[in-house]
Curated annotation (Swiss-Prot):
It is found in: Cell inner membrane. Keywords: ATP synthesis, Cell inner membrane, Cell membrane, CF(0), Hydrogen ion transport, Ion transport, Membrane, Transmembrane, Transmembrane helix, Transport. This is ATP synthase subunit b. F(1)F(0) ATP synthase produces ATP from ADP in the presence of a proton or sodium gradient. F-type ATPases consist of two structural domains, F(1) containing the extramembraneous catalytic core and F(0) containing the membrane proton channel, linked together by a central stalk and a peripheral stalk. During catalysis, ATP synthesis in the catalytic domain of F(1) is coupled via a rotary mechanism of the central stalk subunits to proton translocation. Component of the F(0) channel, it forms part of the peripheral stalk, linking F(1) to F(0). The lineage of its organism: Bacteria, Pseudomonadati, Pseudomonadota, Betaproteobacteria, Burkholderiales. It holds the Pfam family ATP-synt_B. F-type ATPases have 2 components, F(1) - the catalytic core - and F(0) - the membrane proton channel. F(1) has five subunits: alpha(3), beta(3), gamma(1), delta(1), epsilon(1). F(0) has three main subunits: a(1), b(2) and c(10-14). The alpha and beta chains form an alternating ring which encloses part of the gamma chain. F(1) is attached to F(0) by a central stalk formed by the gamma and epsilon chains, while a peripheral stalk is formed by the delta and b chains. The gene is atpF. It comes from Cupriavidus pinatubonensis (strain JMP 134 / LMG 1197) (Cupriavidus necator (strain JMP 134)). The chain crosses the membrane at residues 7-27. Gene3D superfamilies: 6.10.250.1580. The keyword Cytoplasm does not apply. Belongs to the ATPase B chain family. It is a single-pass membrane protein.
């Protein structure tokens, strides 16, 4: 192989070029590649963190929804229970009012029956006295015979 000056000149130019590239071009290029790799890694980490936060947020939302459903069901159950209690209370009040009205009507009827009996007793006593008067053809004194008349009323 023939080694001539051209080859040595090419070698010198190659080493000078290699030194310039290694000194001035390679470090910024490596730095840019490292920065880009770091940005990509940071982006992937941020994406993973965002994905984890999204899953956590979804879990919190699901939990909040479950709590809201439970609370809503509890409120509905409480409202139904209150409505049932109110209906029972109204029913009991109505029954008590009906019983009171029935008792009052029975008492009034009893009073009317008692008054009617008293009135009938008085009328029967008067009729008995008049009948006895006519039978005896003389007047019976009501004051003198009040015991007899009271006994007659009691028997009727």
């Amino acid at each position: 192989m023939n080694l001539n000056a051209t080859f040595f000149a090419q070698m010198v130019v190659f080493f000078i070029l290699w030194w310039v590239v290694a000194k001035f071009i390679w470090p910024p290029l490596v730095k840019a590649l490292d920065e880009r790799a770091k940005k990509i890694a940071d982006g992937l980490a941020a994406a993973e963190k965002g994905k984890a936060e999204l899953e956590l947020a979804n879990k919190r939302v699901d939990q909040a929804m479950a709590e809201a459903r439970t609370e809503g069901a509890q409120r509905v159950a409480d409202a139904e229970k209150r409505a049932q209690l109110t209906a029972e209370e109204i029913k009991q009040n109505a029954q008590a009012e009906a019983a009171r009205i029935i008792a009052q009507a029975k008492a009034e009827a009893e009073q009317q029956v008692t008054r009617a009996r008293e009135s009938l007793r008085d009328q029967v006593a008067v009729l008995a006295v008049k009948g006895a008067e006519q039978i005896l053809k003389r007047e019976v004194n009501a004051q003198v015979h009040s015991d007899l008349l009271n006994q007659l009323k009691a028997e009727l």
